[in-house]
Structure formats: C-alpha cells, structure tokens
From Swiss-Prot:
The lineage of its organism: Eukaryota, Viridiplantae, Streptophyta, Embryophyta, Tracheophyta. This is Pumilio homolog 23. Signal peptide: none annotated. Sequence-specific RNA-binding protein that regulates translation and mRNA stability by binding the 3'-UTR of target mRNAs. The keyword ATP-binding does not apply. One of its GO terms (cellular component) is nucleolus.
Length: 753
C-alpha cells in the first residue's frame, strides 16, 4: 500500500529537467484510462463531439447574408498561438492520482491540505499547460487551486501567465482557468490581498491583450474572458445576466410590469474590483482593426464577450461613448462637431447586420446601456423608417423590442406609433407579438398614444364589422386564433394552453386608465363562467384576472367577474397560480363574497394545508377564525376595511397609484370607490413570465425582517468603502481607452497614449 500524506507527497521539482519545454505531439497523454470516473466527466458542448480545441472556433452565428463566416484576417490569427501538449509521464500521473485519492478520503487536516496543495502546485511549474489541459489531472488541479493559499494561487497564475490563453481555450483547461479566477475572487474580502491579486491579474491581462482575438472567438476562452472581466469589475462571477441570459427582471422592465423602479439597472458590486485593470483589458480587446471588429460583431462567442463588457460599463456614459463607437465600427466622437454621429454608410452596414443572430443580441445590449445622445443618434440614423421591416425579422425583432422599451420621449413614441401601429395585425399574424407588447408598455410609461394603442389592438384582433366582445378570448389564445384559417369560425379552445405573450399584453392593457380599456373590460366580464374559471386555472390567464382586479375598473364590473368564480374558489386555491387569484378576489370583494370564499376554503382546508401555498393562504384569510367564530371574523373584516378606508381618506387617496375598491359591506357597495390594499406580494404578482412558479414562503415572514445575508452584505460594503476612501490625486483627464496601463495602482483608470 502506498503511504500518502503531506510528508509522503513532497514537491518533485528536482525531477523536472529540460523535458518541461512545450514540445511533443498535440493531444497525446499517457492517461489512457479505459474507464473514467463518472463524477469527473464534463458535458460536451452542443455540436462539439471531440476534444480538439479547433472545433470550438467554428462560428455558429445566425448569419446575415452579407457577412462572411470568417474573415481572411481571422484565419491568419486563428492559428498563431497554438500549443502542442507533451505527454504526462506516468510518475506525474501517479503523483496527482494519489493526491486525488487522499482528498477523496477526507482524512486530511486543514493545515496538511494546504501544504499538499502548495507542493503539488509547485510541481506544475513549467508544465502548467500540459497538466491543466490533461482531462484527468485537470480535475485534481482544480481542487488544488480551490484549496491553496493566496500566495500559492498567485504564484501558479504568474507562472502560467504566458500560456494562460492556451489553457483557457482548452476544453479541460478552461475549467482550471475558471477555478483559478473563482479562487481569486474569494480573497477579495481581504483588503490586504488586493495588491497581490492585481499583480497576478496584470500578468494574465498583459498576455491576453497581445492577441485577444483567439480567446474572444473561442467557445471556452470567451467564457473564461467574461469571468475575468467580471472579476476586474468586482461583480459576481456567476451572474446569469452578465453571460447573455435574459432575466425575468429585464422582461418585466421591458413590458413595464415592474412595480418598483428603485433597483433598475443596478449592478450589484460586492467588491471594489480593479478599475484600472478593467480599462486596460477592454482597451486591448477593442484595439483591433475595423475588419476584425466586423467579424467579432457576428461571431457567437466574441459577441458574448462584448455584451458582458457593455453591461459592466452600465451608467458610465463617458466610457460607453468611447466603447460603443468602436464596437459599431464608426468613428468615435468628432471633436469638431458636438455630440456623437453615425455616418450614412455605417448606418446601412449596421442595419444589414441586424438580421444576424449574434449581432442582434449585441445591439440589444447596446440599446440597453447607451447614453441618451447615442440612443437618439441610433434611433434617427439607423432605425427610423425601418422599424416594421426589422420587426418581422426572426432576429431583428428583438432589437426593435429593446429599442421601443428604451424610448426616451413622446416624440420617439410618435414615430414608432406611425410606423408600427397600422401594422399591428401583420405583426400578430407573423408571431411578432412581443413588438406589440413593447409598444403598449412604452405607451403607458411615456403616457402617450394610450387610447390609440388600445384601439389599434382592438382593430388588429377584431374586424370592423365584428363585435368587440371577443377581444379577450382571442388575445388569451393568440396563436390559436391567428393560426386559424377561417377566423370567423374560431371558438374558445377548451383545455388549451393560453398564449403567454397574449396574456402579457392584456396585463399591460389593464394598467391603462379604465377610460381607454372599456372594450377589454366588457369582453372579460361578459365571458361565460366556465371560461372565467378556466382562465383562472391557467398560469398565464390567472395573471390577467389579477391585473383586472388590480386595475381602476368600476366596482360593479369587478364584482361581476368574481361572482362567476363562485363555487370554484376551493378548487382554485389548490392550484399554485389559482391561489393568488383567490387572494386577489378576497381583497377586492364585499363581505358577503368574502364569506363565500372563506366557506369554500374551509371545505378544502385539509387538502389545502398540504399544499405549498396553503398555510399562507389559510393564515392570510383567517380561515381558522372563520371556522371557530364566524361573527367575530365578520366584525374583524369590517373593522380592517373601515380603518383602511379612513387612512386613505386622511392621507390623500387621489395621489395614490393603487386601484380603488369599496367592497366593505353590502351597504357600502355603491359608495365612492377607495384604494385597494397594497399587496405585500407585489413582486410575485407582477412576475413577468407566466411559466415561472410563484412562491409564498418568503412573503409569509414579517416584512420588516431582513433578507438572509442582507446585514452581512451591508457590513462588507461599508468595510470596502472605508478601505477605499482615499483622496484622489488631481491630474489631467485622459480618454478611457487610451492605451497601456501605467503602473499597478488599482485605483487609477489612466492609461498611456
């Protein structure tokens, strides 16, 4: 048996001689195991069956017809920095296998583990590329990097800096590179470690900026590069939004469904990061020719790198005014002419490339972060008079949605209205309902063309000689209706899934004043009781009913809908989405209907208590109190509502944005309308995508109770701010992307020209 421990696993650096040079046949390894540990296996990337790094270079962009899949320039630099792997000798393989077995046994003490990690990392000196890219040993190396001390980690990074891009572009090596960056991020809480970490990062960035195109266009390398950008910024390395994923918050903002705007566009930065290093790295990534940038725009992986870089520079307008012109391949701000300008020929190129999948994603992000002057220039020079043409394109329609959502003023809203509103029917028929939803949302946000938008949507769904009573069912089943050949014979589709975007459009519609949406209100309240019940059971349709109950529609109209749900509240409460509708109905109805709801929930109390949402709903509606003492329960309900009505009267309900209702008792049903109680679950109720689950547990706690980790986050933030609160040296202002780094001061953003 082999004895394994810190003493039996010393560093074997004395055995490393000239064989450490990077020579030998690429791809060979002595670790030809017949069977590999399933727990150590990594998933293949889609479309990538082998281990060859070159296979990851393939451009998988959607591709505009005028864009070449790869430029001649790229084919030249694509193979400039190829490394060949040397075989791993059996003794080295055995050494790391013993370490893996030792760590798996969980018999190593913390101090001994640190010594083993240090010795093993020292063993990789001069052979970092071979060991990091070995499919088996790379797993062990990841464990070592995650468990070593900071000085050992930084030493490994500095030693491997010259081959770091090659490691990052390898299928196995990319995981090692990411582990190294993640491990560095864990030490950022220690202010004393910043200088050491910055030195290690500088050694990596210096090599990357010498030839960034290879790494940007590689499927593995681009992912590592995005993590490196996040680390330099000081943000979480695992934020999905920074890796191209569209979050529910982004969709909520786009469709104007978000209640609070306080946290819009706020990027959580737990650490101060390395602003000088970020500037240096971005300068190197963007210092390429116009021809190279044309390729980077449409390459799947480099586009993601550019998107991450733009999101990290959010609200830094001065820097964005330098970065975005470089990405769009137009000249930076002309000093002789005030403001930012896009030439006509460049605007045409941007417009033609917009139909490319990767470039369309990139332009979406540009529109999200663009300063007002740049947005206005793009709107007038690129998009104006081409909105409908782009709206019906498979990729460009998402760009138009982003453009509409970030409209600055009513004048722009008017231009978009003139080009798109007359074509609402065409957009819906071609499945581009997202463009319609975005225009309706921005109309409500800018308070412009509200009535016209509502009327245009009615005209798109119902012909002139048709009754408007069918507007709601057709929007609920938008795809079924427009997919029907003979629309005059279309009927309600029982049991079918309701259209998510159609329901989102209706949620936006019910945010308008009731004066603009009477056809929609009439259509909803005129639906058959079984249709109303089916809508409430659907996860998307339930949100439409909730939006209607939260609107400023008349009290009698809301009551008419709630009455049609009578007899089904118990059944609805057993559904996760339906339980929210039950709660909304309870808040919006009179005492008689509240009793009916409580009675129905009491009948299903046993089954309801077993569901995820049941305990909260039973407690919120006080079903136990109703069961034991119904008279006292009724008195409490009246007292609660009366107290709230007095509060609204005293503090000016006319200025409130909340909807009104007067369902206190039977005697007060026809009185003046009052404001609906603000729902403590507003974030859940206004969740933008109906396919997502809504959870009650986190809302059942006291509102004043801080979220887990909130106190700790604030303490860390204060500590960091105190550590970085130093007087800034006065000096001349330099361009953001102006060249090379000057020194290693992390507080400096200046670069040599």
């Amino acid at each position: 048996m082999v004895s394994v421990g810190s003493k039996s696993l010393p560093s074997r650096r004395h055995r490393t001689i000239e064989e450490d040079s990077l020579m030998g046949e690429r791809g060979k390894s002595s670790n030809n195991h017949s069977e590999r540990n399933k727990g150590m296996r990594r998933k293949d990337h889609k479309g990538n069956r082998g281990f060859d790094v070159d296979s990851s270079k393939k451009n998988q962009s959607g591709g505009a017809p005028n864009v070449k899949p790869a430029s001649k320039k790229h084919s030249e630099f694509e193979h400039q920095n190829q490394f060949v792997r040397k075989e791993i000798d059996p003794e080295t393989s055995k050494y790391f296998s013993e370490i893996a077995n030792l760590f798996d046994s969980n018999e190593v003490e913390l101090e001994e583990r640190s010594v083993i990690c240090g010795n093993a990392l020292e063993e990789t000196r001069g052979r970092e590329y071979e060991i990091a890219t070995d499919y088996i040993i790379s797993h062990v190396l990841q464990t070592l990097l995650e468990g070593c001390e900071l000085d050992q980690l930084c030493s490994f990074i500095r030693n491997s800096a010259s081959v770091f891009p090659a490691i990052a572009m390898d299928r196995s090596g990319s995981h090692v590179a990411e582990s190294a960056l993640k491990s560095l991020a864990t030490h950022l809480e220690n202010p004393d470690a910043y200088s050491v970490i910055e030195e290690a990062l500088h050694s990596i960035c210096k090599v990357i900026v010498d030839n960034p195109l290879d790494m940007m266009c590689n499927c593995y390398g681009s992912h590592v590069l995005r993590r490196l950008l996040c680390l330099c910024k000081g943000v979480s390395l695992d934020s999905p939004e920074l890796y191209g994923a569209k979050s529910s918050k982004a969709l909520a903002k786009r469709l104007n469904l978000k209640m609070s705007q306080l946290d819009d566009n706020n990027l959580e930065i737990p650490h101060q990061g390395f602003p000088g290093m970020l500037t240096y790295l971005l300068s190197g990534l963007l210092s390429c020719s116009r021809e190279d940038m044309k390729y980077l725009q449409v390459d799947q992986y480099s586009s993601l790198v550019l998107q991450t870089a733009l999101r990290l520079m959010l609200k830094q307008d001065e820097q964005l005014l330098e970065i975005i012109p470089l990405i769009l391949r137009c000249n930076s701000t002309n000093k002789k002419v005030e403001g930012f300008h896009i030439e006509t020929n460049v605007a045409k190129e941007i417009l033609e490339s917009m139909k490319d999948n990767s470039f369309s994603h990139l332009v979406e992000v540009i529109l999200e972060v663009a300063p007002e002057s740049l947005y206005n220039e793009m709107f007038n020079k690129v998009f104006k008079n081409s909105l409908f043409e782009l709206s019906v394109d498979r990729c460009a329609n998402f760009v138009i949605q982003a453009l509409i959502s970030h409209a600055r003023d009513q004048e722009q809203m008017g231009i978009m209205w003139e080009e798109l509103a007359p074509r609402f029917k065409d957009l819906l028929e071609q499945g581009k309902s997202g463009v319609v939803a975005s225009l309706i949302a921005v109309s409500q946000r800018l308070q412009s063309h509200e009535n016209k938008c509502c009327e245009a949507l009615v005209g798109a769904v119902c012909s002139t000689n048709e009754s408007r009573i069918s507007i709601l069912p057709r929007l609920l089943f938008l795809d079924y209706y427009f997919g029907c050949r003979d629309k005059s014979t279309w009927e309600w589709a029982p049991g079918a899934k309701m259209h998510v975007m159609g329901c989102l459009i209706l949620q936006g519609i019910f945010k308008f004043s009731s004066d603009h949406i009477q056809p929609y209100i009439t259509s909803l309240t005129s639906m058959k009781a079984e249709y109303i019940t089916e809508t409430a059971k659907d996860s998307s349709g339930a949100r439409v009913i909730e939006a209607f109950l939260a609107s400023d529609a008349a009290t009698k109209q809301k009551r008419r809908l709630i009455i049609k749900l009578r007899g089904h509240f118990g059944e609805l409460s057993l559904h996760t989405s339906g339980s929210f509708t039950v709660e909304k109905c309870f808040d919006a109805c009179n005492l008689t209907l509240r009793e009916a709801i409580a009675s129905e929930l009491l009948d299903v109390k046993v089954d309801l208590s077993k569901t995820k949402q049941g305990p909260y709903l039973l407690r919120k509606l006080d079903i136990d109190g109703y069961a034991s003492r119904p008279d006292q329960w009724k008195s409490r309900q009246e007292a609660k509502q009366s107290t709230y009505n007095e509060f609204c009267s005293a503090f000016g309900s006319n200025k409130s944005n909340f909807p009104k209702n007067t369902f206190v008792s039977d005697a007060s049903e026809d009185a003046a309308q009052e404001i609906e109680v603000k729902n403590t679950r507003k974030e859940i109720d206004h969740h933008p995508t109906s396919g997502f689950k809504r959870h009650r547990e986190k809302h059942a706690k006291d509102k004043d109770e801080p979220f887990a980790g909130e106190k700790r986050s604030k303490q860390k933030k204060n500590k960091t701010s105190e550590a970085t609160d130093k007087p800034k040296l006065a000096g001349s202002k330099r361009p953001f992307l102006s060249g090379e780094m000057t020194g290693k001061n992390r507080h400096s953003n200046k670069m040599r020209i």
